[in-house]
Protein backbone atom coordinates (compact mmCIF):
# COMPACT_ATOMS: atom_id res chain seq x y z
CA UNK A 1 0.00 0.00 0.00
CA UNK A 2 1.52 3.33 -1.15
CA UNK A 3 1.58 6.44 1.05
CA UNK A 4 -0.85 8.31 -1.22
CA UNK A 5 -3.26 5.38 -0.87
CA UNK A 6 -2.90 5.46 2.91
CA UNK A 7 -3.68 9.19 3.00
CA UNK A 8 -6.83 8.58 0.98
CA UNK A 9 -8.12 5.75 3.14
CA UNK A 10 -11.65 6.72 4.11
CA UNK A 11 -12.15 7.66 7.75
CA UNK A 12 -8.56 8.43 8.76
CA UNK A 13 -9.55 11.89 10.02
CA UNK A 14 -12.35 10.48 12.19
CA UNK A 15 -10.05 7.76 13.45
CA UNK A 16 -7.51 10.46 14.24
CA UNK A 17 -10.04 12.21 16.47
CA UNK A 18 -10.99 8.99 18.25
CA UNK A 19 -7.38 7.91 18.34
CA UNK A 20 -6.01 11.08 19.86
CA UNK A 21 -8.59 10.87 22.64
CA UNK A 22 -7.74 7.24 23.34
CA UNK A 23 -4.00 7.86 23.23
CA UNK A 24 -4.22 10.87 25.56
CA UNK A 25 -6.71 9.14 27.87
CA UNK A 26 -4.77 5.89 27.99
CA UNK A 27 -1.51 7.74 28.57
CA UNK A 28 -3.06 9.55 31.53
CA UNK A 29 -4.48 6.41 33.12
CA UNK A 30 -1.42 4.28 32.32
CA UNK A 31 0.88 6.70 34.12
CA UNK A 32 -1.58 6.64 37.01
CA UNK A 33 -1.71 2.82 37.17
CA UNK A 34 2.08 2.57 36.96
CA UNK A 35 2.50 5.17 39.70
CA UNK A 36 -0.08 3.41 41.87
CA UNK A 37 1.71 0.09 41.31
CA UNK A 38 4.83 1.51 42.91
CA UNK A 39 2.86 3.29 45.64
CA UNK A 40 0.73 0.43 47.00
CA UNK A 41 2.98 -2.60 46.32
CA UNK A 42 2.39 -5.90 44.54
CA UNK A 43 -0.10 -7.40 47.03
CA UNK A 44 -2.45 -4.40 47.08
CA UNK A 45 -2.02 -3.96 43.33
CA UNK A 46 -3.10 -7.56 42.85
CA UNK A 47 -6.08 -7.04 45.16
CA UNK A 48 -7.02 -3.93 43.19
CA UNK A 49 -6.97 -5.89 39.92
CA UNK A 50 -9.12 -8.58 41.56
CA UNK A 51 -11.78 -6.00 42.44
CA UNK A 52 -11.54 -4.46 38.97
CA UNK A 53 -12.26 -7.89 37.48
CA UNK A 54 -15.36 -8.22 39.67
CA UNK A 55 -16.44 -4.69 38.71
CA UNK A 56 -15.90 -5.46 35.03
CA UNK A 57 -18.02 -8.61 35.07
CA UNK A 58 -20.75 -7.02 37.19
CA UNK A 59 -20.99 -3.92 35.01
CA UNK A 60 -21.47 -5.98 31.86
CA UNK A 61 -24.15 -8.07 33.55
CA UNK A 62 -25.89 -4.83 34.54
CA UNK A 63 -25.58 -3.26 31.08
CA UNK A 64 -28.09 -5.84 29.76
CA UNK A 65 -26.40 -5.93 26.36
CA UNK A 66 -26.85 -2.20 25.86
CA UNK A 67 -23.33 -1.25 24.80
CA UNK A 68 -22.87 -2.21 21.17
CA UNK A 69 -26.66 -2.31 20.77
CA UNK A 70 -26.65 1.40 21.59
CA UNK A 71 -23.90 2.14 19.08
CA UNK A 72 -25.25 0.02 16.22
CA UNK A 73 -28.88 1.21 16.38
CA UNK A 74 -28.01 4.82 17.11
CA UNK A 75 -25.91 4.72 13.94
CA UNK A 76 -29.01 3.41 12.14
CA UNK A 77 -31.12 6.32 13.46
CA UNK A 78 -33.20 4.32 15.97
CA UNK A 79 -34.17 6.34 19.11
CA UNK A 80 -33.31 3.49 21.45
CA UNK A 81 -31.02 5.39 23.85
CA UNK A 82 -33.52 6.30 26.65
CA UNK A 83 -34.76 2.72 26.92
CA UNK A 84 -31.23 1.32 27.21
CA UNK A 85 -30.27 4.00 29.73
CA UNK A 86 -33.32 3.13 31.85
CA UNK A 87 -32.53 -0.58 31.87
CA UNK A 88 -28.88 0.11 32.65
CA UNK A 89 -29.64 2.40 35.59
CA UNK A 90 -32.05 -0.07 37.21
CA UNK A 91 -29.83 -3.11 36.67
CA UNK A 92 -26.61 -1.41 37.81
CA UNK A 93 -28.26 -0.09 40.98
CA UNK A 94 -29.42 -3.59 41.88
CA UNK A 95 -25.94 -4.98 41.14
CA UNK A 96 -24.32 -2.26 43.26
CA UNK A 97 -26.49 -3.12 46.27
CA UNK A 98 -25.72 -6.84 45.96
CA UNK A 99 -21.98 -6.19 45.67
CA UNK A 100 -21.96 -3.92 48.71
CA UNK A 101 -23.65 -6.62 50.78
CA UNK A 102 -20.99 -9.12 49.66
CA UNK A 103 -17.80 -7.03 49.80
CA UNK A 104 -18.77 -4.01 51.94
CA UNK A 105 -16.75 -1.87 49.53
CA UNK A 106 -18.45 1.34 48.43
CA UNK A 107 -15.89 1.83 45.67
CA UNK A 108 -16.86 -1.44 43.98
CA UNK A 109 -20.55 -0.53 44.03
CA UNK A 110 -20.26 3.02 42.75
CA UNK A 111 -17.82 1.92 40.02
CA UNK A 112 -20.36 -0.54 38.61
CA UNK A 113 -23.03 2.17 38.32
CA UNK A 114 -20.50 4.61 36.87
CA UNK A 115 -19.18 2.21 34.23
CA UNK A 116 -22.64 1.23 33.00
CA UNK A 117 -23.77 4.85 32.71
CA UNK A 118 -20.57 6.20 31.16
CA UNK A 119 -20.14 3.38 28.64
CA UNK A 120 -23.69 3.83 27.39
CA UNK A 121 -23.01 7.56 27.01
CA UNK A 122 -19.87 6.89 24.97
CA UNK A 123 -21.59 4.30 22.79
CA UNK A 124 -24.42 6.72 22.02
CA UNK A 125 -21.96 9.45 21.06
CA UNK A 126 -20.01 7.07 18.81
CA UNK A 127 -23.24 5.84 17.24
CA UNK A 128 -24.07 9.45 16.34
CA UNK A 129 -20.52 9.79 14.96
CA UNK A 130 -19.89 12.86 17.14
CA UNK A 131 -16.18 12.17 17.34
CA UNK A 132 -15.09 15.59 18.65
CA UNK A 133 -17.59 15.34 21.50
CA UNK A 134 -16.29 11.86 22.22
CA UNK A 135 -12.77 13.28 22.43
CA UNK A 136 -13.74 15.93 24.98
CA UNK A 137 -15.74 13.61 27.23
CA UNK A 138 -13.31 10.69 27.10
CA UNK A 139 -10.24 12.77 27.97
CA UNK A 140 -12.07 14.81 30.63
CA UNK A 141 -13.18 11.63 32.40
CA UNK A 142 -9.61 10.29 32.49
CA UNK A 143 -8.31 13.51 34.01
CA UNK A 144 -11.08 13.51 36.62
CA UNK A 145 -10.39 9.83 37.33
CA UNK A 146 -6.76 10.50 38.23
CA UNK A 147 -7.52 13.59 40.33
CA UNK A 148 -10.43 12.04 42.24
CA UNK A 149 -8.74 8.66 42.73
CA UNK A 150 -5.69 10.28 44.29
CA UNK A 151 -7.91 12.47 46.47
CA UNK A 152 -10.11 9.62 47.69
CA UNK A 153 -7.12 7.31 48.15
CA UNK A 154 -5.59 9.69 50.66
CA UNK A 155 -9.00 10.17 52.33
CA UNK A 156 -9.76 6.45 52.66
CA UNK A 157 -6.15 5.32 52.97
CA UNK A 158 -6.98 2.12 51.04
CA UNK A 159 -7.61 0.96 47.48
CA UNK A 160 -11.33 1.52 48.15
CA UNK A 161 -10.63 5.23 47.70
CA UNK A 162 -9.16 4.61 44.24
CA UNK A 163 -12.32 2.77 43.22
CA UNK A 164 -14.56 5.52 44.61
CA UNK A 165 -12.70 8.08 42.51
CA UNK A 166 -13.05 5.79 39.50
CA UNK A 167 -16.82 5.56 39.87
CA UNK A 168 -17.45 9.23 40.68
CA UNK A 169 -15.38 10.40 37.69
CA UNK A 170 -17.84 8.63 35.36
CA UNK A 171 -21.03 9.62 37.15
CA UNK A 172 -20.18 13.30 36.72
CA UNK A 173 -21.31 13.03 33.07
CA UNK A 174 -24.79 11.76 33.91
CA UNK A 175 -26.43 14.99 32.74
CA UNK A 176 -26.11 13.58 29.21
CA UNK A 177 -28.45 10.76 30.23
CA UNK A 178 -30.91 13.31 31.62
CA UNK A 179 -30.93 15.15 28.28
CA UNK A 180 -31.61 11.87 26.49
CA UNK A 181 -34.66 11.23 28.70
CA UNK A 182 -35.81 14.81 28.13
CA UNK A 183 -35.58 14.63 24.33
CA UNK A 184 -37.02 11.14 23.80
CA UNK A 185 -39.35 8.88 25.76
CA UNK A 186 -38.57 5.39 26.99
CA UNK A 187 -40.01 3.01 24.41
CA UNK A 188 -39.56 -0.66 25.24
CA UNK A 189 -41.14 -1.70 21.95
CA UNK A 190 -37.91 -0.59 20.27
CA UNK A 191 -36.08 -3.14 22.41
CA UNK A 192 -38.68 -5.89 21.94
CA UNK A 193 -38.42 -5.54 18.16
CA UNK A 194 -34.66 -6.06 18.42
CA UNK A 195 -34.56 -8.53 21.30
CA UNK A 196 -32.72 -11.16 19.25
CA UNK A 197 -29.80 -8.87 18.49
CA UNK A 198 -29.87 -7.46 22.02
CA UNK A 199 -29.77 -10.92 23.61
CA UNK A 200 -27.03 -12.12 21.27
CA UNK A 201 -25.06 -8.97 21.97
CA UNK A 202 -25.60 -9.40 25.71
CA UNK A 203 -24.20 -12.92 25.56
CA UNK A 204 -21.31 -11.64 23.44
CA UNK A 205 -20.46 -8.94 25.99
CA UNK A 206 -20.80 -11.37 28.91
CA UNK A 207 -18.59 -13.96 27.25
CA UNK A 208 -16.01 -11.31 26.31
CA UNK A 209 -15.89 -9.93 29.85
CA UNK A 210 -15.67 -13.40 31.38
CA UNK A 211 -12.89 -14.12 28.91
CA UNK A 212 -11.02 -10.95 29.89
CA UNK A 213 -11.36 -11.37 33.66
CA UNK A 214 -11.48 -15.08 34.49
CA UNK A 215 -7.68 -15.28 34.57
CA UNK A 216 -7.50 -12.70 37.37
CA UNK A 217 -10.20 -14.46 39.39
CA UNK A 218 -8.25 -17.74 39.07
CA UNK A 219 -4.78 -16.32 39.79
CA UNK A 220 -5.78 -14.67 43.08
CA UNK A 221 -6.66 -17.90 44.96
CA UNK A 222 -4.22 -20.06 42.96
CA UNK A 223 -1.00 -18.01 43.12
CA UNK A 224 -1.81 -15.07 45.40
CA UNK A 225 -2.18 -11.31 45.03
CA UNK A 226 1.55 -10.68 44.59
CA UNK A 227 1.70 -12.79 41.42
CA UNK A 228 -1.57 -11.24 40.27
CA UNK A 229 -0.06 -7.78 40.72
CA UNK A 230 2.80 -8.65 38.35
CA UNK A 231 0.40 -10.20 35.86
CA UNK A 232 -1.88 -7.16 36.00
CA UNK A 233 1.07 -4.90 35.23
CA UNK A 234 1.83 -7.07 32.20
CA UNK A 235 -1.76 -6.66 31.06
CA UNK A 236 -1.45 -2.87 31.40
CA UNK A 237 1.48 -2.93 28.99
CA UNK A 238 -0.56 -5.15 26.65
CA UNK A 239 -3.44 -2.67 26.88
CA UNK A 240 -1.11 0.07 25.64
CA UNK A 241 -0.16 -2.09 22.66
CA UNK A 242 -3.83 -2.66 21.83
CA UNK A 243 -4.78 1.02 21.81
CA UNK A 244 -4.75 1.37 18.02
CA UNK A 245 -6.97 -1.68 17.30
CA UNK A 246 -9.40 -0.39 19.91
CA UNK A 247 -9.43 3.04 18.31
CA UNK A 248 -10.08 1.65 14.85
CA UNK A 249 -12.85 -0.62 16.16
CA UNK A 250 -14.71 2.36 17.62
CA UNK A 251 -14.64 3.94 14.18
CA UNK A 252 -15.33 0.86 12.04
CA UNK A 253 -18.32 -0.47 14.02
CA UNK A 254 -20.72 2.38 13.12
CA UNK A 255 -19.24 2.44 9.61
CA UNK A 256 -19.79 -1.31 9.19
CA UNK A 257 -23.29 -0.85 10.61
CA UNK A 258 -23.98 1.77 7.93
CA UNK A 259 -22.65 -0.48 5.16
CA UNK A 260 -19.51 1.56 4.47
CA UNK A 261 -16.24 -0.01 3.29
CA UNK A 262 -13.60 -0.46 6.05
CA UNK A 263 -11.31 -3.10 4.53
CA UNK A 264 -8.29 -0.88 3.85
CA UNK A 265 -8.19 0.67 7.30
CA UNK A 266 -8.43 -2.77 8.92
CA UNK A 267 -5.49 -4.10 6.90
CA UNK A 268 -3.45 -1.02 7.78
CA UNK A 269 -4.27 -1.55 11.47
CA UNK A 270 -2.97 -5.13 11.39
CA UNK A 271 0.29 -3.98 9.77
CA UNK A 272 0.83 -1.27 12.39
CA UNK A 273 0.04 -3.73 15.20
CA UNK A 274 2.85 -6.01 14.02
CA UNK A 275 5.45 -3.33 14.71
CA UNK A 276 3.83 -2.53 18.05
CA UNK A 277 4.14 -6.20 18.98
CA UNK A 278 7.89 -6.04 18.31
CA UNK A 279 8.19 -3.11 20.73
CA UNK A 280 6.47 -5.16 23.41
CA UNK A 281 8.77 -8.12 22.88
CA UNK A 282 12.09 -6.29 22.77
CA UNK A 283 11.70 -2.83 24.34
CA UNK A 284 9.20 -3.12 27.21
CA UNK A 285 11.26 -5.69 29.21
CA UNK A 286 14.15 -3.21 29.21
CA UNK A 287 12.03 -0.34 30.56
CA UNK A 288 10.09 -2.09 33.35
CA UNK A 289 13.13 -2.88 35.59
CA UNK A 290 14.09 0.79 35.50
CA UNK A 291 10.63 2.16 36.27
CA UNK A 292 9.32 -0.57 38.62
CA UNK A 293 12.17 -2.78 39.89
CA UNK A 294 9.89 -4.53 42.43
CA UNK A 295 7.85 -6.01 39.57
CA UNK A 296 10.64 -8.29 38.32
CA UNK A 297 8.26 -11.13 37.43
CA UNK A 298 6.49 -8.93 34.88
CA UNK A 299 9.70 -8.77 32.81
CA UNK A 300 9.26 -12.41 31.78
CA UNK A 301 5.52 -12.03 31.15
CA UNK A 302 5.49 -9.06 28.79
CA UNK A 303 7.30 -10.66 25.78
CA UNK A 304 4.91 -13.62 25.97
CA UNK A 305 1.80 -11.46 26.29
CA UNK A 306 3.01 -9.31 23.38
CA UNK A 307 2.57 -12.29 21.04
CA UNK A 308 -1.20 -11.92 21.37
CA UNK A 309 -1.28 -8.44 19.81
CA UNK A 310 -1.74 -9.68 16.23
CA UNK A 311 -4.39 -12.33 17.06
CA UNK A 312 -6.37 -9.84 19.14
CA UNK A 313 -6.13 -7.17 16.44
CA UNK A 314 -7.46 -9.54 13.80
CA UNK A 315 -10.17 -10.70 16.22
CA UNK A 316 -11.32 -7.13 16.84
CA UNK A 317 -11.40 -6.26 13.14
CA UNK A 318 -13.54 -9.30 12.31
CA UNK A 319 -15.78 -8.63 15.32
CA UNK A 320 -16.56 -5.19 13.90
CA UNK A 321 -17.68 -6.78 10.63
CA UNK A 322 -19.91 -9.34 12.35
CA UNK A 323 -21.52 -6.86 14.75
CA UNK A 324 -22.05 -4.33 11.97
CA UNK A 325 -24.04 -6.99 10.11
CA UNK A 326 -26.05 -7.73 13.29
CA UNK A 327 -24.46 -11.18 13.30
CA UNK A 328 -23.15 -11.48 16.83
CA UNK A 329 -23.46 -15.25 17.29
CA UNK A 330 -20.01 -15.86 15.84
CA UNK A 331 -18.55 -13.32 18.26
CA UNK A 332 -20.21 -15.19 21.11
CA UNK A 333 -18.76 -18.49 19.91
CA UNK A 334 -15.32 -16.90 19.60
CA UNK A 335 -15.51 -15.56 23.14
CA UNK A 336 -16.64 -18.94 24.44
CA UNK A 337 -13.68 -20.60 22.72
CA UNK A 338 -11.29 -18.11 24.35
CA UNK A 339 -12.91 -18.63 27.75
CA UNK A 340 -12.94 -22.42 27.44
CA UNK A 341 -9.34 -22.74 26.26
CA UNK A 342 -8.12 -20.27 28.89
CA UNK A 343 -9.85 -22.00 31.80
CA UNK A 344 -8.80 -25.51 30.75
CA UNK A 345 -5.18 -24.59 30.03
CA UNK A 346 -4.49 -22.13 32.82
CA UNK A 347 -4.43 -24.71 35.63
CA UNK A 348 -1.92 -27.21 34.16
CA UNK A 349 0.29 -24.47 32.72
CA UNK A 350 0.24 -22.48 35.96
CA UNK A 351 1.20 -25.62 37.86
CA UNK A 352 4.15 -26.19 35.52
CA UNK A 353 5.36 -22.61 34.96
CA UNK A 354 3.50 -20.57 37.63
CA UNK A 355 2.59 -17.07 36.42
CA UNK A 356 4.46 -17.54 33.11
CA UNK A 357 2.13 -20.46 32.40
CA UNK A 358 -0.85 -18.13 32.77
CA UNK A 359 0.60 -15.83 30.11
CA UNK A 360 1.14 -18.81 27.79
CA UNK A 361 -2.47 -19.93 28.35
CA UNK A 362 -3.62 -16.39 27.52
CA UNK A 363 -1.82 -16.44 24.16
CA UNK A 364 -3.07 -19.93 23.28
CA UNK A 365 -6.67 -19.00 24.14
CA UNK A 366 -6.82 -15.87 21.99
CA UNK A 367 -4.97 -17.53 19.12
CA UNK A 368 -7.53 -20.35 19.13
CA UNK A 369 -10.54 -18.04 18.99
CA UNK A 370 -8.94 -15.85 16.32
CA UNK A 371 -8.35 -18.92 14.15
CA UNK A 372 -12.06 -19.71 14.42
CA UNK A 373 -13.07 -16.13 13.59
CA UNK A 374 -10.84 -16.05 10.50
CA UNK A 375 -12.21 -19.38 9.27
CA UNK A 376 -15.82 -18.27 9.77
CA UNK A 377 -15.23 -14.88 8.16
CA UNK A 378 -13.66 -16.44 5.06
CA UNK A 379 -16.42 -19.04 4.88
CA UNK A 380 -19.16 -16.40 4.93
CA UNK A 381 -17.34 -14.14 2.48
CA UNK A 382 -16.91 -16.96 -0.04
CA UNK A 383 -20.55 -17.94 0.42
CA UNK A 384 -21.76 -14.41 -0.34
CA UNK A 385 -19.61 -13.98 -3.44
Stretches with model-predicted labels:
Residues 15-25, 78, 82, 125-150, ...:
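Alpha-helical transmembrane segments of multi-pass membrane transporters/permeases
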Residues 17-29, 141, 159-177, 181-254, ...:
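Transmembrane helical elements of multi-pass membrane transporters/channels
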Residues 27-35, 92-99, 139-158, 172-176, ...:
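Alpha-helical transmembrane segments of multi-pass membrane transporters
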Residues 86-203, 307, 311-316, 320, ...:
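Hydrophobic transmembrane helix module of multi-pass membrane transport proteins
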Residues 7-64, 199-226, 342-347, 362, ...:
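Signature of the first transmembrane helix
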Residues 23, 27-30, 62-63, 68, ...:
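Alpha-helical transmembrane segments of multi-pass membrane transport and lipid-handling proteins
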Residues 29, 33, 59-78, 238-260, ...:
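Helix-loop junctions and terminal segments of transmembrane helices
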Residues 11-12, 49, 75-90, 195, ...:
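Interfacial transmembrane-helix starts/ends
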Amino acid sequence: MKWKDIKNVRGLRSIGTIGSSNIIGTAITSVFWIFIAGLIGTDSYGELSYFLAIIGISSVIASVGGGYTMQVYTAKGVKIAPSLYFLGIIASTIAAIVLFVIFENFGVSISVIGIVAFNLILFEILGKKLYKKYFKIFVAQKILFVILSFAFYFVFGTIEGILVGYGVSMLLFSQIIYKSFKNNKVNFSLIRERIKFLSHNYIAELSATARNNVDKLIIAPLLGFSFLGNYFLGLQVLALMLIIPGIVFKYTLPEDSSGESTGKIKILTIIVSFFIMLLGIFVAPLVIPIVLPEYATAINLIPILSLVVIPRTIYVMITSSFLGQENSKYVVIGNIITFGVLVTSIFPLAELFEITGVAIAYVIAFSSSTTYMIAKYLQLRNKNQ
